Amino acid sequence: MVVTFLFILGVVYGVKPWQEARAGSFNYGEALQKAIMFYEFQMSGKLPNWVRNNWRGDSALKDGQDNGLDLTGGWFDAGDHVKFNLPMSYTGTMLSWAAYEYKDAFVKSGQLEHILNQIEWVNDYFVKCHPSKYVYYYQVGDGGKDHAWWGPAEVMQMERPSFKVTQSSPGSAVVAETAASLAAASIVLKDRNPTKAATYLQHAKDLYEFAEVTKSDSGYTAANGYYNSWSGFYDELSWAAVWLYLATNDSTYLTKAESYVQNWPKISGSNIIDYKWAHCWDDVHNGAALLLAKITDKDTYKQIIESHLDYWTTGYNGERIKYTPKGLAWLDQWGSLRYATTTAFLAFVYSDWSGCPTGKKETYRKFGESQIDYALGSTGRSFVVGFGTNPPKRPHHRTAHSSWADSQSIPSYHRHTLYGALVGGPGSDDSYTDDISNYVNNEVACDYNAGFVGALAKMYLLYGGNPIPDFKAIETPTNDEFFVEAGINASGTNFIEIKAIVNNQSGWPARATNKLKFRYFVDLSELIKAGYSPNQLTLSTNYNQGAKVSGPYVWDSSRNIYYILVDFTGTLIYPGGQDKYKKEVQFRIAAPQNVQWDNSNDYSFQDIKGVSSGSVVKTKYIPLYDEDIKVWGEEPGTSGVSPTPTASVTPTPTPTPTATPTPTPTPTVTPTPTVTATPTPTPTPTSTPTVTPTPTPVSTPATSGQIKVLYANKETNSTTNTIRPWLKVVNSGSSSIDLSRVTIRYWYTVDGERAQSAISDWAQIGASNVTFKFVKLSSSVSGADYYLEIGFKSGAGQLQPGKDTGEIQIRFNKDDWSNYNQGNDWSWIQSMTSYGENEKVTAYIDGVLVWGQEPSGTTPAPTSTPTVTVTPTPTPTPTVTPTPTVTATPTPTPTPTSTPVSTPATGGQIKVLYANKETNSTTNTIRPWLKVVNSGSSSIDLSRVTIRYWYTVDGERAQSAISDWAQIGASNVTFKFVKLSSSVSGADYYLEIGFKSGAGQLQPGKDTGEIQIRFNKDDWSNYNQGNDWSWIQSMTSYGENEKVTAYIDGVLVWGQEPSGATPAPTVTPTPTVTPTPTPAPTPTATPTPTPTPTVTPTPTVAPTPTPSSTPSGLGKYGQRFMWLWNKIHDPASGYFNQDGIPYHSVETLICEAPDYGHLTTSEAFSYYVWLEAVYGKLTGDWSKFKTAWDTLEKYMIPSAEDQPMRSYDPNKPATYAGEWETPDKYPSPLEFNVPVGKDPLHNELVSTYGSTLMYGMHWLMDVDNWYGYGKRGDGVSRASFINTFQRGPEESVWETVPHPSWEEFKWGGPNGFLDLFIKDQNYSKQWRYTNAPDADARAIQATYWAKVWAKEQGKFNEISSYVGKAAKMGDYLRYAMFDKYFKPLGCQDKNAAGGTGYDSAHYLLSWYYAWGGALDGAWSWKIGCSHAHFGYQNPMAAWALANDSDMKPKSPNGASDWAKSLKRQIEFYRWLQSAEGAIAGGATNSWNGRYEKYPAGTATFYGMAYEPNPVYRDPGSNTWFGFQAWSMQRVAEYYYVTGDKDAGTLLEKWVSWIKSVVKLNSDGTFAIPSTLDWSGQPDTWNGTYTGNPNLHVKVVDYGTDLGITASLANALLYYSAGTKKYGVFDEEAKNLAKELLDRMWKLYRDEKGLSAPEKRADYKRFFEQEVYIPAGWTGKMPNGDVIKSGVKFIDIRSKYKQDPDWPKLEAAYKSGQVPEFRYHRFWAQCDIAIVNATYEILFGNQ
């Protein structure tokens, strides 16, 4: 193939845009030295001894453990702590290139060792990231979590997941860039370490092959939003091949490098290789061209690199890079200096080469010198930290700042100097602010220094300089790192109570410790003189954040000096946040009553005497110790000994790990010795006194109590550009209130008069129903000169008694984003980050104050009293009301008529830069981001400018537009939709963008900055951008787009209108044009700008997805799916929490398997995946499916931190504990002598996936931490794993004790909850998870269909990685196929030998599998399950895993095991089919859960005994009709896909029974079975179905369970469609399903989906059901509920009494009535949506 490149000859200008450097302007040796040292401050992992500073320590030592790897090492990216391998490997390559080109400079300056150290350090890390040929880990750390915390690297506590690319989920750009780094490193390290260089080279070759074979970045997703590979991967393929050629001299690589040149980035709309952008982490083609030019001497490459360097120097093709007034070549606001200095390096390297034209050598060199000198300070200030004149002192860098308080403002200075760091650089006008929050101009990064180092090496060769001899960054601490503050709470004649706070503000380096303790010294002379012993002192604590107080201990007996030991061992204290770096204890020391205590002679009393109660001072007389080493304070004298006492020794027990299966007794592992720690007491905080000012005139809070306000502060920094008060309004009265009568006032100081904007990001009542008004007070008062008035539209509805509005998320800001100071604001309570009553946020009904206290001195609103009627005071007129509300423009403005010729402008006054931010052609939102450039010579008033974006509307609808953010102010941007008089190619509409006068003047050579625009149709139906005139799909970065036209005074001055459009007038070079005025623009939105905040990142808010469209061509049932899908995703419905986790139900008072509605289950997550798979089928949008899987993986699959599974013996997987019929037989004793079998899966899975971690969902999660256990037992974080069922098949949900999966003995009794379930001599801290196999199988089933449908659409590549995850989940799901203790099938004696492998496999999907282990990783265990219910089987998933090439698991036996399981499952159904056709219960391999002998005559299935209710028995598991519908739907799908005859026969009989029992009533209602009654048993299975004449079923109760109705209909539809494919069409089954769908839809729709009334007679068990607790056992729930013998269900769940539905339930119980509720269960809504889509897919509009 012949490839033609188009090059345009450059134009050389005569004026140099830069200031020439003076020879030897700076000490380049010192600059080079420090620029290299910068990388020492970025090092992650265990630091080597050659590091030259004392403030960096080991960090991120667990990186990679989530995948069973050591991924420690490398560099942190910037001022954060994520390891992004794309910019990191680019940096590694650039440093090696510097050493390759300018080795002499490094040798002469003494810096060669230091740069080679860094090259070796980073490439060693890359080797770790490449554990096998086609696996590469490209990122460690989560950008969102990392950026949400501000603190030093050494004490990070957040999860740091690792992300990989593979053959099926590739990332060619990052893999090839890493190959380049390793190849380049192999060259420069060859002399120093030839063995390591050879290793690097081999990895480079393998990685290059990986990148080249895959040629895709589809798997490179985790870095999106941070380091997207915008330029693609072909530039990296060339770049890496060049370095491999240089390393190997193998011409094959040179050929490869040249072959990809044709694919390098092009100038938009042309075939010209891009020459404008800089060589950087994303785009390395300019560097590749330079090296290819030097290697080949070909003109092609010379011209590429010279056009680039010409553009950056004298100009090329009439264009030149922008220069600042002081001479910086300025490319972009982000890292302007990194681009300029890297281009300088390329200029140096190319000008050094003999092939560079003589006339250009000096030009390029002088350019390079000027840019480096600019960075070093030629303008009067240095941009390199720690170098030169006026250098940056406050870079945006967490570890250098070293905050202990998770705050950019604490401390107010940087504790460390980040020597050598090149900051981002100035704006285009040379402006620069040295501020920690200025991450645009003042952040640093590895890639910023990457080209800078090489350029400095060249400057050193040119001009010399003297590195500082033996330079090290050894610092003297600027503050006390550890100290104690103390004060007196109270004192009396015989006691003193001390309030003490231990502080860890360490920074040299920062360190976390859980071994702090202090000594409080006392003189006991008075006590001893009175005849008492020191041991008669009494010690007690009040508020305690984790200390153990003991003593007294002798210090100096001759002087009667003793000390009290306050030991925080076990409590982690680290410089990572307000509640992390300090811990408080309040302890009392009391002598006997008649002893007169004299505090004045106590050594530790010296500094605290006279301190007012509640206050503290720093005191050196209370010494502090870290692991017995004194780190603070002074001890009294030296006459005594100072041992660190051990008051009591805890013996080392033998651990007894326990599992948490659902629902079954807890299994245990072989014990390993583990220390049992003393649990940390739960703190009881003291309340903060509230000061109530006396106002004048008096404003009295309401006493009528109609409403009150709950407040949560979501911005804890006092200095901030955004205030975030989140609110809930509570109706505390007895009658409903119309919310449109209610207003709320938030009082604050504006701190600089500006226009302001407010918005509700999300509100349960609907954000669009919330209004805002800013009101300026007539005169300022203490704490306020403004208030924000929050009101409600009529759509907010009525607020019922005892209810609240739900969360209302509010934020407001000044339009110029300047800061507020909240510190003195009346309504702000810094510490109230969770909801509580705030009386300083006032509430009004009809303008009358009914809640709270207005600030003193305001003219108060009227107040409400029980007797007086008050006339409301009118609200003052607000000074600013910029509330953003999107306003649609349904009626288009006609196109103005003018001259019928459209000629591109030649006047050149302005041009438009465009970036496309929506690359999908089919979308419901168009996102053109723009910049307007003044390319003329005089300023332009932007109010005269309009822009037109031309497109096709694709279905006439009202439309809305908004600017989310604009540098000129989003409120200054206007919009108007204009319909063309007749359609033309590419357009029937244009969006006209205009500017208000506030946008100001646009100066010559300047641009407006970014204007972020999006528009949509008001019904959110789709556009098809594919044929739109203005849309350029590939232009995702800014470039000139002449199809976006621009006008001044209505005259076309830029771009080309579509052919045939009635054009605007145009400007030509000579005639004078009378412009046609454009009608005044009609704004369609008054937007609120939302740039990144300057202090802290925006917190996560409730998910607010873009409303989905109804795709064109859908019939009635597809439209139903879309309607319900939107209801489920509408935040106002309440199906998800703010993290995107689906609740079990919208309603909270509900008790089923989860005992609270806002828990969730793996079942809900599996339905979530299924719902979004169907959404992808109907819309072609697979992003929602991916989000569902990502959320599932993030929250429901335990992470590496959640499951430290490091020590597991598959030959002894667990210790036996029997199951018992009823809870009162528990705890179950461990029996160590009972044999258990071998686990045959473990080694195979570890070998396949390289990890000991399990990949399956735990079944139960406390989404919002309702119980209070927290994630991994921290007590506070939401989304925590919990468990309930533990004690045999008779333990109903009403008899469970909810407990944490992460057991640290913090709650429950002394052994946590373990000794309720397992009897042992000793108990150890441990974790336990339980998998519900039917849920994992459903997620796999759904993913199979997603795969099929995505392939039909040609979009399989979008979800291929998720199909791989489903296959992996299926690999691990095989544990459900094995007996609990791996006993052979038919085992009827617990003492019989265990299985030796697959002889323990029953191949069915059992009730659960479970795994667990010690918190410290010392031991682990796994179990299967002996009990299998037909309702858990999933032949559809089994078939996919056994037969589908994309779904087959990777392990050697995975697919074959699933093939056996598929056959066994179908036999299981046939064995259990009753004479009538319904399916009976299941089978067990462990009779009574203890491997007892089967009763005589029991039917068997492959040696397993028939069990009517093989799972739970209260109520009997197979009395519930739901299992029939759920399970047979999967059989029907399997039949539809395969035509399997056994499945068809099974279904034919089952469907016949269904038709006979479903009721379609004449009044339009329906009923399906709800409760079944069983008799008899099946015949023993011999491979043939006998008809089971002795197994019978009766329907004993009916209902309208909507979710099960949907699942039943789904089964009927797939069966019917299968009969149409493979036999005689059962249209009756289809019609029955359709009738059920139609009746359900007609009868039960509501505002949140579909719901039917449910009578809940079982709810009396809230009050009556005793939860069995053994006599004498006592403990506590996290909220303080006492657990003891005799407690009822509600006694240990007292928080239910706060539920809004509790009064209704309680009233019904007291009156003897059966309460009735409506529920919106997440799984049921999904089932209903899915079945409607199933009808659409299978039968269309029939």
UniProtKB/Swiss-Prot annotation:
Domain of life where this protein originates: Bacteria
Active site, UniProt feature: D80 (nucleophile), H396, D434, E443
Compositional bias segments (type: Pro residues): 652-670, 680-698, 1066-1108
InterPro entries per record: 6-hairpin_glycosidase_sf, 6hp_glycosidase-like_sf, CBM2/CBM3_carb-bd_dom_sf, CBM3, CBM3_sf, Endo-1-4-beta-glucanase_dom2, Endoglucanase_F_dom3, Glyco_hydro_48F
Biological process annotations from GO: cellulose catabolic process
Post-translational events: The linker region (also termed 'hinge') may be a potential site for proteolysis.
Keyword Repressor set for record: no
Bias kind Low complexity: ranges: 636-651, 858-872
GO molecular function: cellulase activity; cellulose binding
Signal peptide segment: 1-23
Stretches that traverse the bilayer: none
Region (Catalytic 1): 24-476
Keyword Mitochondrion: no
Family that this chain belongs to: In the C-terminal section; belongs to the glycosyl hydrolase 48 (cellulase L) family.
Protein name (Swiss-Prot/TrEMBL): Endoglucanase A
Organism for this UniProt entry: Caldicellulosiruptor saccharolyticus
